[in-house]
Regions:
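Periplasmic-binding protein-like
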Residues: 61, 106-117, 171-176, 207, ...
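An alpha-beta-alpha
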Residues: 158-199, 304-322
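Hydrophobic alpha-helical segments within soluble ligand-binding/sensing domains
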Residues: 134-137, 142-174, 184, 214-222, ...
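Alpha-helical recognition/docking segments in bacterial nutrient-uptake
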Residues: 57-162
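Flexible loop/turn connectors
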Residues: 223-327
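N-terminal helix-turn-helix DNA-binding module of bacterial transcription factors
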Residues: 1-56, 326
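Short beta-strand elements in bilobed, periplasmic/extracellular small-molecule ligand-binding domains
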Residues: 83-95, 173-174, 189, 193-215
Length: 327
């Protein structure tokens, strides 16, 4: 004979609405009440095809920001695989652009967020992420942020500037996103490390904040060319591809008329025409730092978090999109 929800409610001594909330996992139900409902279901032999038992494995959100860079996707993929190898369930909601996917993951039981964004997200679950080396972190109200690794953007900028200065460039511009913590930190380090910072020039004129898009890069590089820049550092891959296209459309050549340095390497950078000089990131090192911090935060590993997170300095990968400045 088929067991009904009314019978379950009667056996547990609760309302039908309470039984529905327990089955649908909606709304607040006291743990003791939930236990009584589950016990009544077991005693009566109630079951249905959509009734899922609690998974013994924990759920972790591994997230890149919306419209991510190649290095961010690579790191997230490595982290997700490693966590699955440790018998954790993984979901991949995007963060920053839309809070709903992450909130859905949290409501589904995610116990931690691992992300390659540098923006503080103020989540109600532990957020394991990357930060800029010299950034002052604002601790979230719940105290849930774990900085697993730091990027030495200042050192990366210095490396790019040293490379460009060595081949005669002084008027160096920056193309960056018009929003986001990474753009903020890149601008700050650009102004602090620029070789012309003590010459009384307005370096803001050599910064172009544009959307993270192909068209944004095309527009920005021509604006900086008109501002007499001879070289540019570009934040995103889309902007870099757009910058190369914009220069070609004006019948200018890279690197003869403009040297270009990208931020973050990817397989396509070898085929950008000319192959792009970039500041490459240690994908393996960043991945391992995030994996270790996650396992320690979830107490799967007992080695403990390092007192100082590891620091990763971008390294220059010199190709043919940079050359000596024209005299």
């Amino acid at each position: 004979m088929k067991v009904t929800l009314d019978e379950v409610a009667a056996r547990a001594g609760v309302s039908l609405a309470t039984v529905s909330r327990v089955l649908g996992r909606r709304g607040a139900v006291a743990e003791s009440t939930r236990a009584k409902v589950l016990e009544a279901m077991s005693e009566l032999g109630y079951s249905r095809s959509t009734l899922l038992h609690d998974a013994p494995r924990r759920l972790v959100a591994v997230s890149a920001p919306g419209n991510p860079e190649h290095w961010q996707v690579q790191v997230c993929t490595r982290v997700a695989k490693a966590l699955q190898d440790h018998d954790l369930l993984v979901t991949r909601p995007l963060v920053e652009t839309d809070p709903e996917p992450l909130q859905t993951a949290i409501e589904a039981g995610a116990v931690a967020l691992v992300t390659t964004t540098m923006t503080s997200l103020n989540t109600e679950i532990p957020c394991i992420r990357v930060a800029e080396q010299s950034a002052t972190e604002e601790v979230s109200e719940a105290g849930t942020e774990v900085i697993a690794a730091r990027l030495d953007l200042g050192g990366g900028m210095t490396t790019a500037f040293e490379h460009l200065r060595a081949i005669g460039h002084r008027r160096i511009g920056l193309i960056c996103n018009d929003s986001g913590e990474l753009a903020v930190q890149l601008i700050r380090r650009f102004l602090a490390e620029h070789p012309a910072r003590n010459l009384g020039l307005n370096l803001e004129d050599w910064i172009s904040r544009v959307p993270k898009s192909f068209s944004g890069g095309s527009r920005a590089v021509l604006e900086l060319k008109d501002a007499t820049c001879t070289a540019v550092i570009v934040q995103s891959a889309l902007q870099l591809h757009g910058a190369l296209h914009g220069l070609r459309n004006r019948h200018l050549q890279v690197p003869r008329d403009m040297s270009v340095v990208g931020f973050g390497d990817s397989p396509t950078m070898k085929f950008t025409g000319p192959p792009a000089t970039v500041l490459g990131l240690d994908v393996e090192g960043l991945s391992n730092a995030l994996i270790d911090a996650t396992l320690q935060t979830l107490r799967i590993s007992t080695t403990g978090l390092p007192s100082v997170p590891p620091v990763f300095r971008p390294r220059l990968v010199a190709r043919t999109s940079t050359t000596a400045a024209r005299q």
